[in-house]
Curated annotation (Swiss-Prot):
One of its GO terms (cellular component) is cytoplasm. This is Exportin-T. Pfam families: Exportin-T, Xpo1. tRNA nucleus export receptor which facilitates tRNA translocation across the nuclear pore complex. Involved in pre-tRNA splicing, probably by affecting the interaction of pre-tRNA with splicing endonuclease. Keywords: Cytoplasm, Nucleus, RNA-binding, Transport, tRNA processing, tRNA-binding. Its main location: nucleus. It is found in: Nucleus; Cytoplasm. Belongs to the exportin family.
């Protein structure tokens, strides 16, 4: 048996073993746990001469798993086995690999958890006594000693740490029962054994200092002390003799880190403020830390953390003493803590904070954050009026000591905010990390100081910016711009606590105007070839352009800077792409009204960037092949906005941009080639033209009025309409030539959508040709979705235009027919996919669990999903007729023949479609509105200007009655629809179905006389008898339909479904 286990362990651990065999090996070991003799077998493995380290490790792991689920007899067997196993190791001084020592310690810890204390029936109450004797460390009970086993002490410390992890570590979530058990174990340890543990640790540390060796043992003992301190009596450890011994290990390079961590844990122990202050005063850690000389970075990190921890604890004392009602004692404690921070801790922490390594700096952040938070509560005179910090501040006068601290902290922030001089262009990740972790936190500290005392902040940061702006090194100038951004944000967020009316004339605002002017005049800056400086400059002036002043000259100066090698013509791709976007962003938010002469010069400068150069898509279809073009579109939009907003209302300059595009487009068409590169070039040109049109429109019309036809008609000049009519013609010619290509169809639709608000009613002529071209094209599903959305937008924009009405009257039937060709194709594909799925399901039945199909399984293929999306777009298109009061189009002479098809789409659903709640809700909403507006047979929409000219359709009311009423009863009750009224999505559908019934009743004449209302008559005389609904229930439903309003009937209908299906 043992040999078999060894073979299985070897197989499971062999990298060459195949996955199937490895799984079988692991399954075998898992099954062995269920063997009645598993405990005995794996205990035997520990001492079997044929077991290697791996077999022993696996055996120990399995025994760990078994300990928690076995009887006291088995536990005793495991205890005796592991004790003898470990005794042999100690007696022969066999120091196994660390992973084995940890696993042995884990097994002993598991035995402790299940055998120690009253909670475990006192099965092993002499645990620590036995362990100390077993590990040959009992000499440490009486004092320092040389006569103990270092290996035994190593095991003892590891076991202590693992026991603490199990019973006291708050990192892991435990059940209430587990937590109760752990608390009982800790209580027993406090009463019986903690004093012994503390004594052994103390004598061990004392012995190792005397011996000046085995410092690796000191490290693990210090870890023990740090782990246990949170829940043992602190006086056992915090006394002068014990602390002095711990302190001593700060003097040794091998133990500095562990000692620092241990001291951090000690001072973090929860206690009353006065007791904590006494502890910190006794420890006097800052003097000790300050006396330590140069060391490696890891040690510095821990020492910085230790100094910060002292400051953090003092800050907590200060906060606690300032809460609630203060006594003389609390005031004295608070003052003593504050003085200790200012005189001892702060200088040391600020020294660590200014260290060249950011990892050391970061250790200081918790203390600085906590202390500044307290200072805000005590001294803050800033902060946005009405915010918590402004309301809750005690506004005490800021004394000189605290002023000095704030100034010193600001100076450290200024120093540490500068990017490392050694940073090269390839260190982008390091700089981003620096910005995210260090700079962002330092900015928060600066902001806190601004809130505490705006004058200190403003005086120091303004001097800092002034000096930095005169620098020639890129890191200094970059920092100056960064700090200008911070100052702008301080003003924007009103950290200075000013009234709104005072902000624009405040000293801070005046300073920013001055700094912005200096920045634009800084010749060193614009000669600097550094992408961090360049991008940060443009980010600053765009985000905070209001500080540039209202003079158009500033805007022109900045636009010229954009159009230089410093900006949009930069050699760095990252700068180029970012500035192209920021250029347009700046134009959009500032909307400068430039004269045509100035504008012409700017456009001439930008023209090289408006040349479209395509990159042929790679064979693998990568989307990264032409990423530049998307950013290039921003320039077209920005140029369009400048032209649209020009001060002279002259738009001939548009030709300067459009003519090259038209020429290039003519070239593409004249080549008589439809190669991928030519098609892509044509697509890009169309997109550029559409984007230019959008920009021009945005420059002319206020952003919130771009879709207002009256405003557009008033503001858009006749010459512009002629130019954009010409654009529409160009788009149609291009579309006609390249209509087989989806990208061209997309670009054409995009451009036309941008022309609609500009040309208004003038677009109709062009739109009719565009729609015909689309209908003649081989559209894909997603294209049809977008096309229907485009048509819906046109319905919304031009529903009051007579020409539009005629256009849609002519095109509605062809559009629906085109739509049905696509729907039929998708239906065929979906059915075919389902057939293959069923065949595969039969073949896999019984062999593959994933082949099982329940009665509720919905097979979702790509074709099915496309069909659902297309129907959703279709219903949205139909809804646009309702929303814009043109449902009469559906009843016109031209479209009456297609109406049954449309209504059939709204009245026929398969079980899969019922599960698509959002689509069903939209469809039923359209159906309800159709019933509302022409359910009686004639168009009754009072807002539809063509309603009176549409004759009544005979039989339409009867059609609605005979088709909608069954729908309202079949969907909830027919088994194939799997309708569950308790499901939220089904309940939504039920509510919509109730509205269908209610609206059908109203449009059939309403009233209380069943015989005079065709809908009620059909229900009582035809449908209810047909479905064999009890007459009492039928009359109840009729009565509710007559007497209840829509909301009340909806509630009744849902309740009825519940009653009939429960």
């Amino acid at each position: 048996m043992l040999q078999r286990i060894r073979e299985v362990v070897s197989l499971a651990n062999n990298p060459a073993t195949d996955a199937v065999t490895k799984k079988q090996a692991l399954d075998y070991l898992e099954q062995m746990k269920s063997d009645p003799n598993a405990i005995q077998i794996f205990c035997s493995m520990l001492t079997d001469s044929g077991s290697d380290d791996l077999c022993i490790f696996v055996s120990l792991q399995i025994l760990c798993d078994l300990v928690a689920m076995n009887t006291s007899v088995d536990l005793l067997f495991v205890k005796n086995s592991i004790v003898e196993f470990l005794r042999g190791k100690i007696n022969r001084n066999i120091k196994d690999a660390e992973f084995l020592r940890n696993k042995i310690s884990e097994l002993i810890t598991r035995l402790f958890i299940n055998m120690y204390g009253e909670v475990n029936g006192n099965q092993w109450n002499t645990f620590y006594k036995d362990l100390i004797a077993l590990l040959s460390i009992d000499s440490l009970l009486t004092g320092p000693s040389e006569h103990f086993s270092p290996l035994g002490l190593d095991y003892f410390a590891r076991i202590c740490i693992q026991i603490n992890s199990e019973v006291a570590d708050q990192t892991f979530l435990r059940s209430k029962d587990e937590q109760t058990k752990n608390n009982n174990l800790k209580d027993t340890m406090r009463l019986e054994d903690v004093q012994t543990l503390v004594t052994i640790w103390f004598n061990c540390l004392k012995s190792l200092i005397i011996q000046q060796q085995n410092f690796e043992l000191a490290v693990i003992i210090l870890s023990c002390i740090g782990a246990f301190i949170s829940w043992v009596d602190i006086t056992l450890i915090v006394n002068p003799e014990y602390i002095n011994i711990i302190y001593g290990y700060l003097d040794y390079s091998d133990t500095k880190i562990a000692c620092s961590q241990c001291l951090c844990e000690i001072i973090s122990k929860k206690m009353k403020p006065v007791d904590k202050l006494t502890l910190l005063s006794m420890l006097n850690l800052t003097d000790k830390v300050a006396s330590i000389g140069e060391d490696d970075i890891d040690v510095y990190e821990k020492l910085a953390k230790l100094a910060s921890s002292v400051g953090l604890e003092l800050s907590i004392i200060l906060e606690q003493c300032n809460e609630g009602v203060q006594s003389n004692e609390t005031l004295e404690v608070a003052n003593a803590a504050d003085q200790q921070v200012l005189n001892q801790v702060a200088p040391l922490v600020l020294k660590f904070m200014s260290h060249e390594y950011d990892s050391v700096t970061e250790q200081c952040f918790p203390f600085i954050s906590q202390y500044l938070a307290i200072l805000k509560k005590l001294f803050a005179i800033g902060g946005k009026p009405g915010t918590a910090v402004a309301i809750n501040s005690k506004r005490q006068p800021l004394d000189e000591a605290h002023q000095n601290f704030l100034v010193s902290l600001l100076n450290v922030c200024f120093e540490k905010m500068k990017i490392d001089d050694s940073s090269e262009s390839n260190s982008e990740e390091a700089i981003e990390e620096f910005n995210d972790i260090v700079r962002s936190k330092l900015k928060v500290f600066q902001d806190s100081i601004a809130v505490i005392n705006p004058n200190i902040y403003l005086e120091n940061i303004s001097n800092h910016i002034q000096v930095s702006l005169a620098g020639t090194d890129w890191t200094v100038l970059e920092l100056a711009i960064f700090q200008m951004h911070n100052l702008c944000e301080s003003i924007r967020n009103n950290l200075f606590g000013l009234n709104k009316t005072e902000i624009s004339t405040s000293a801070a605002t005046q300073l920013m105007h001055k700094f912005m002017a200096l920045l634009l005049q800084n010749s060193n800056l614009f000669q600097m070839d550094n992408r961090y400086v360049q991008i940060l400059f443009f980010e600053l002036v765009v985000r905070h352009y209001t500080f540039l002043g209202s003079d158009t000259k500033d805007a022109v100066s900045l636009l010229n800077i954009f159009c230089s090698e410093f900006g949009m013509f930069n050699k760095s791709e990252k700068v180029i792409l970012r500035t192209w976007y920021l250029f347009t962003r700046f134009v959009k938010i500032s909307k400068p009204h430039l004269s045509v002469s100035v504008l012409s010069q700017l456009v001439s400068k930008v023209m090289p960037l408006l040349v479209i150069k395509t990159v042929t898509p790679s064979v693998d279809g990568s989307e990264d092949c032409d990423t530049t073009f998307d950013s290039q579109l921003y320039i077209f939009e920005g140029v369009g906005m400048l032209i649209g907003a020009n001060a002279d209302n002259t738009y001939d300059i548009l030709d300067q941009v459009l003519t090259p595009l038209f020429t290039d487009l003519e070239r593409c068409i004249s080549l008589q080639s439809q190669s991928p590169s030519i098609v892509l070039q044509s697509h890009h040109i169309l997109m550029a033209i559409g984007t230019l049109a959008r920009g021009t429109h945005m420059g002319l019309v206020p952003e919130n009025q771009v879709n207002n036809a009256l405003v557009n008609e008033k503001l858009i000049h006749r010459t512009l309409i002629e130019k954009f009519s010409n654009i529409a013609e160009v788009v149609l010619v291009t579309f006609s030539y390249f209509n087989k290509h989806e990208t061209i169809r997309d670009a054409s639709r995009f451009t036309f959508a941008r022309l609609i608000p500009i040309l208004n009613g003038g677009i109709v002529t062009f739109a009719s040709k565009l729609v015909v071209l689309f209908l003649e094209s081989d559209l894909k599903t997603m294209e049809m979705n977008d096309f229907l959305g485009f048509l819906g937008q046109m319905v919304h924009t031009f529903h009051g235009d007579e020409n539009f009405y005629d256009l849609f009257d002519n095109l509605l039937t062809p559009v629906i027919n085109k739509l049905h060709i696509l729907l039929d194709h998708l239906e065929s594909e979906s059915n075919e996919s389902n057939w293959y799925g069923e065949q595969n399901g039969r073949e896999n039945n019984g062999n593959d669990v994933s082949g099982a199909r329940t009665s509720k399984t919905v097979v979702v293929t790509d074709s099915y999903r496309d069909k659902i999306l297309l129907k959703k777009a279709y219903y949205g298109f139909l809804q646009s007729f309702v929303t814009n009061n043109v449902t009469s189009l559906l009843l016109s002479n031209r479209n009456r023949s297609i109406l049954p098809t449309i209504l059939g789409d709204l009245l026929s659903y398969n079980p899969q479609e019922i599960q698509e709640t959002s689509t069903m809700k939209l469809a039923l909403n359209v159906l309800v509105n159709f019933i509302k507006f022409f359910g009686s047979g004639g168009c009754t929409d009072v807002n539809d200007v063509h309603a009176s000219s549409i004759g009544k359709l005979d039989g339409l009311n009867e059609y609605f009655i005979t088709r909608t009423i069954p729908l309202a009863f079949e969907i909830p009750f027919k088994p194939q629809y799997k309708f569950n009224i308790n499901d939220g999505s089904c309940r939504v559908i039920a509510c919509d179905l109730s509205r269908v019934l209610k609206e059908m009743y109203i449009q059939s004449g309403g009233g209380q006389d069943v015989n005079s209302n065709p809908a009620l008559k059909y229900l009582t005389e035809v449908y209810f008898p047909q479905i064999q609904l009890p007459s009492e229930l039928g009359m109840e439903l009729i009565q509710m339909l007559i007497t209840q309003d829509t909301k009340a009937f909806e509630k009744y209908y849902v309740t009825l479904i519940n009653r009939l299906t429960s």
